[in-house]
Amino acid sequence: MTENNQDLKQNWTRHREGVVQAACGTQLTAKSWLTEAPLRMLMNNLDPEVAENPNELVVYGGIGRAARNWECYDKIVESLTQLNDDETLLVQSGKPVGVFKTHSNAPRVLIANSNLVPHWASWEHFNELDAKGLAMYGQMTAGSWIYIGSQGIVQGTYETFVEAGRQHYDGNLKGRWVLTAGLGGMGGAQPLAATLAGACSLNIECQQSRIDFRIKTRYVDEQAADLDDALARIAKYTAEGKAISIALCGNAAEILPEMVRRGVRPDMVTDQTSAHDPLNGYLPKGWTWDEYRVRSVSEPANVVKAAKQSMAEHVEAMLAFQQAGIPTFDYGNNIRQMAKEVGVANAFDFPGFVPAYIRPLFCRGIGPFRWAALSGDPEDIYKTDAKVKELIPDDDHLHNWLDMARERISFQGLPARICWVGLGQRAKLGLAFNEMVRSGELSAPVVIGRDHLDSGSVASPNRETESMRDGSDAVSDWPLLNALLNTASGATWVSLHHGGGVGMGFSQHSGMVIVCDGTDEAAERIARVLHNDPATGVMRHADAGYDIAIDCAREQGLNLPMIGR
């Protein structure tokens, strides 16, 4: 390391005590709602109710951060408070690098996180850059400032479990149970999603603090003392037809093989540990968490090797369940790839959740549409829930989701909601929300965004674009085009990331957020962005030859030159 690099490293801080929370109400810190919104959502990502490790700037997903370091965070906040409505802030891997004059309909913030030239797109190279303070892993919604806690993935997981139930169990999961692991920011959605889908679940987690948090927020119902206790509870509740979620503190790489040895038969098996990041997200069997964190710094190569070997045993157990006739699927954490790299040749024998259950929704531009109330008032979310029902009156499944969400989901940080809606519906809802702000029905503006896990915004051959009909799994032009189009359409902030969900070298993806501030100008931007964004998903799947997408494109009047209208 050069002397200059040493000086650079001494000038940044990853750990800082204190509490970050978004402001609420209508008083602005920034110059307008267009800059107040990204400021509040950045802070909301680091709210202790939202983030997994806010003192380290970690929001979720291993080391998915909101800013590169605390010095960068402070400068982002300062830049946003001073930003004018004809300027754009550029953020490079969590670091504010420039403010440029643009125009009022341009994004206020453009973000690029953890993008590497493909030949160098590996965890090894990224970790070198990260250690020098030259990069930041943004995951998907951590570095793009639109994470809303575990609710953000609950409905997607719920839709997956419901569709799996429809395919394998005649649409009825009563008396059935799901076996899974991981109760972090993403995996923490699984127990509640299973409950809402009507199934029991056994959720293995190696950190007691995560179990405590999921019980506190009502995502998990109970904790078992050990495996025997857990299986006894599962047997009792499934016999009674109750949908109860049970947590078990332990290591999935040890517990799943033991369940296979015992001949235990779940009704569904998946996994949402942070297997995408073996250095920071997957505990090797036989290790304590504290030992893992220390050795991750002192001997990273050995840690990665041990983690991948444990993943191999985990995946071999999942394969055994599948071979026993139990529906088994990867939930997008790249655990199959990690196992394959250390010798599990048939790791991909069980499918990913997108090709198995979700792709027909993507073909119609349906995906994780989300919004947050900048007022901090839950009533604003309840009013928007009612508006969704009013504007989409015939979708009983969606109405049922909204009712269950209100009853069961605890808000984390700023009140927010997610619901899976598609092309045509998103723009209709966004314009209605903007009008509610204009009329005063909502007490402050709302922001509308989505997960990067959406129909047109991601290239991820082991997850969202696995087994594409035309073989275009690894073509990453599509998320780049999505980001460019959202920028041209006037989204309030746009992000382009690499490595989210499945880790370095395995994905590229883009995100957008738009502010509904009640103005005519906002309405024009909303109409463009919330049409064009899901339309790219329909376009992408139509181009790959999916009839559902081609039909949707024709119904919606999309101008796709290579697809006859």
From Swiss-Prot:
Cofactor section: NAD(+)
Keywords from the named record: Cytoplasm, Histidine metabolism, Lyase, NAD
Membrane-traversing stretches: none
Pfam families, A to Z: Urocanase, Urocanase_C, Urocanase_N
Residues where NAD(+) binds: 61-62, 139, 185-187, 205, 210, 251-252, 272-276, 282-283, 331, 501
Catalytic activity: 4-imidazolone-5-propanoate = trans-urocanate + H2O
Comp. bias regions, Basic and acidic residues: 463-472
E.C. number(s) listed in UniProt: 4.2.1.49
Active-site annotation: 419
BP term (GO), one: L-histidine catabolic process to glutamate and formate
Free-text comment on the cofactor: Binds 1 NAD(+) per subunit.
Principal place of residence: cytoplasm
UniProt xrefs under PROSITE patterns: UROCANASE
InterPro entries xrefs: Urocanase, Urocanase-like, Urocanase_C, Urocanase_central_sf, Urocanase_CS, Urocanase_N, Urocanase_Rossmann-like, Urocanase_sf
Region described as Disordered: 453-472
Subcellular location: Cytoplasm
GO CC annotations, alphabetized: cytoplasm
Function: Catalyzes the conversion of urocanate to 4-imidazolone-5-propionate.
Family: Belongs to the urocanase family.
Protein name: Urocanate hydratase
Organism: Pseudomonas savastanoi pv. phaseolicola (strain 1448A / Race 6) (Pseudomonas syringae pv. phaseolicola (strain 1448A / Race 6))
